[in-house]
């Protein structure tokens, strides 16, 4: 068995697409748009074959995100070494992203 892909709804579809391309080396398809529902998505492919679908619908509600709750926990990406993680973290901070936690070698 193989997980084919993970799908995430995002607020800013183009911003999310550009983030994964710039920082994590994703390759993107041309995108999908259903004009009847205004659903839009991109499939992003990564070097090891993993795929992520990012999606957007106009009627999605952006609810507050609580850290301590059941359900979806996280998605983890490997960039190959601790040095690459540290360099990517520094680049993200320099580009104005908040680093909420980490980088870490293990969770919990």
Mark where each language-model region is:
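N-terminal beta-strand motif that seeds the catalytic metal site of vicinal oxygen chelate
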Residues: 1-15, 72-77
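Short, solvent-exposed coil/turn segments
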Residues: 1-3, 37-39, 47, 68-72, ...
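A short, local hydrophobic-aromatic micro-motif
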Residues: 4, 29, 73, 100-101
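Core segments of cupin and vicinal oxygen chelate
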Residues: 9-51, 56
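Vicinal oxygen chelate
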Residues: 13-14, 75-108
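Short, well-ordered turn and helix-capping elements at secondary-structure junctions
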Residues: 30-32, 56-59, 101-107
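Amphipathic alpha-helical "stalk" segments
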Residues: 35-43, 48-50, 61-63, 77, ...
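Helix-adjacent hinge/juxtasegments
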Residues: 55-56, 63-78
């Amino acid at each position: 068995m193989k997980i084919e892909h993970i799908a995430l709804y995002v607020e800013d579809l183009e911003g999310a697409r550009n983030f994964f391309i710039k920082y994590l080396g994703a390759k993107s398809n041309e995108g999908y748009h259903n004009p009847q529902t205004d659903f839009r998505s991109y499939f992003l492919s990564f070097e090891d074959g993993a795929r992520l679908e990012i999606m957007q619908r106009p009627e999605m509600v952006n609810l507050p995100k609580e850290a301590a709750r059941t359900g979806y926990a996280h998605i983890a990406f490997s960039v190959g070494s601790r040095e690459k993680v540290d360099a990517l973290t520094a680049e993200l901070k320099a580009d104005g992203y908040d680093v909420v936690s980490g980088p870490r070698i293990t969770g919990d």
